[in-house]
A protein has these predicted regions:
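Second-shell residues forming the walls of enzyme active-site clefts
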Residues: 1-40, 45-47, 58-61, 68
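Secreted, periplasmic, or luminal enzymes acting at the cell surface/secretory milieu
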Residues: 19, 50-147, 153-162, 168, ...
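Glycine/threonine-rich flexible loop motifs
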Residues: 143-146, 209-228
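An anion/phosphate-binding loop that grips the pyrophosphate of nucleotide cofactors and donors
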Residues: 202
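Intrinsically disordered, low-complexity Pro/Gly/Ser/Thr-rich segments with frequent PxxP/GP/PP motifs
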Residues: 398-434
Length: 467
């Protein structure tokens, strides 16, 4: 069923890992382990014939690998047309079809996370009569929108934030003025004066900042997660104008937004949204789409907290919630242990509440199940979507268990004032983990369960047992 292929030069890298002495030995080890295809390393083509002659790799092994690859080529139709996927007309008429672009636009909007929204900075209604200053290196950027590892995607075809906004607000009394202010990576502040002057001419300021796409993905580590270059310095100058200040971020991993969280009115995390990025951003900024995405990773208060993840293992000296400053506990002296924005977090242009959590029984045996229900309500004034999340903690196991694990979630659309019931099922399989014997199984014991709107929301809590 398919074939096994390495990562890029994966076989070659075994030499650097000191597993083998040279490329030839690496190829033999890989071939005998069942690796069918050597991705670009050139080791198989250079050494396998010699290895077979020396009896280090069997011909049967080669035949098996070749057959697996040829079978897949046949199934993909490459024997009929080896260039079938390199067709410009196919790309134009299939991949870039209007309905696919619309799907990409909707996906972009649904991927944006609202991190902060003081004073209802967002949305910027099309009914307003205001001037918006668009400041920052990501306002007119197209190149970075596809993100890292975008393959053959045409970066110049991506829609910029500026294009998306000017199309969205065409014919309205919302006017945009623009200044770049700085570039993405350098400390050059020579464009600050123009940006500040532009901001002062506007009613509100929307800064678009982030990272070069090459700063995310493989082999792109950083020691400082603040906005790079002069971007944060520019934000601080924009803040001094006294104008309401919003920020939209284009980046691929968590940033240290501790200053921004304290001083910026509204923050949207847009990520690298792809071809229709600018339209997706404009849909959210205008309020035509109410943001509903949630963080799939925790954002730290500072790099000193890293690694930081919600499902960490327990410590021997946990911090008492009622006394967070207790000495000789596993805590930081200068910041809370908690993230700035936790896993599962995300705001909306409306508000939601989860309550009335119930379990249909407090214990079950293997082969049984428990149903967890809760009520979610849109307590705000506009329609929206939220993600109701269920977390479980195994209180004691033969192998140390995480303090919390996401075990279920449901995205729920609610009109203003509407309520709905959500339900989750807990069974033996949901509680299983790999034990010290490397067998996956659930162990009898006691568990805590929460239903809420992010990984730190513990307002609705209950307990149950597996007997």
């Amino acid at each position: 069923n398919g074939f096994v292929v390495t990562d890029y030069t994966g076989i070659n890298e075994m030499v650097a890992h000191s597993i083998v002495r040279n490329d030839k030995e690496a190829g033999e080890l890989a071939a005998n382990a069942g690796i069918d295809m050597d991705m670009t390393g050139g080791i198989y083509s250079q050494y396998l014939v010699q290895s077979v002659k020396e009896g280090k790799v069997s011909e049967e092994n080669i035949d098996r690998a070749v057959a697996s690859i040829l079978e897949m080529k046949f199934l993909l139709g490459l024997f009929d047309d080896p260039y079938r996927y390199l067709d410009n007309e196919r790309e134009k008429n299939t991949i870039m079809k209007p309905e696919f672009l619309q799907e990409a636009r909707e996906t972009s909007a649904r991927s944006i996370v609202l991190l902060k929204n003081d004073n209802n900075f967002f949305p910027i209604s099309k009914d307003k009569n205001i001037t918006v200053a668009l400041i920052g290196p990501m306002v007119k950027d197209k190149i970075n929108q596809n993100g890292e590892w975008a393959g053959r995607g045409e970066r110049e075809e991506s829609i910029s934030l500026f294009e998306g906004l000017t199309e969205k607000y065409a014919g309205t009394n919302v006017k945009f003025i623009y200044a770049e202010g700085c570039d993405l990576l350098t400390d050059d502040s020579s464009k600050f004066a123009e940006a500040i002057a532009t901001a002062r001419r506007a009613d509100i300021v929307l800064a678009a900042m982030g990272e070069d796409f090459n700063w995310s993905g493989e082999a792109a580590c950083r020691t400082d997660l603040k906005l790079p270059g002069a971007q944060q310095a520019l934000l601080k100058e924009l803040k001094k104008t006294g104008k309401p200040l919003g920020l939209i971020l284009v980046n691929g991993h968590p940033l240290d937004l501790s200053w921004e969280d304290q001083h910026v009115d509204g923050i949207l995390e847009a990520w690298y949204l792809g071809t229709m990025a600018g339209h997706g951003m404009a849909d959210v900024i205008s309020g035509d789409y109410n943001p509903s995405a949630r963080l799939t990773m925790s954002f730290p208060r500072t790099v000193g907290q890293l690694p930081l993840y919600y499902n960490q293992k327990p410590t021997g000296r946990p911090v008492p919630p009622e006394a967070p400053d207790t000495d000789y506990k596993s805590r930081y002296m200068d910041v809370p242990n908690t993230p700035l924005y936790p896993f599962g977090y995300g705001l909306s242009y409306t508000t939601f509440a989860v309550n009335s959590m119930k379990l249909d029984q407090n214990s079950f045996t293997k082969g049984g199940k428990i149903t967890v229900t809760a009520e979610v309500e849109n307590t705000g004034k506009v329609d929206g979507e939220t993600v109701v999340q269920m977390y479980i903690r195994d209180l004691a196991g033969s192998v140390t268990r995480p303090v919390k694990e996401l075990k279920g979630f449901e995205k729920v659309a609610l009109k203003a004032g509407e309520k709905k019931q959500v339900s989750f099922t807990i069974d033996e399989a949901l509680l299983a983990f790999y034990g010290i014997d490397m067998q996956k199984k659930a162990e009898p014991g006691d568990f805590t369960v929460w239903v809420g709107l992010n990984s730190t929301d513990e307002a609705n809590q209950s307990s149950f047992s597996l007997r």
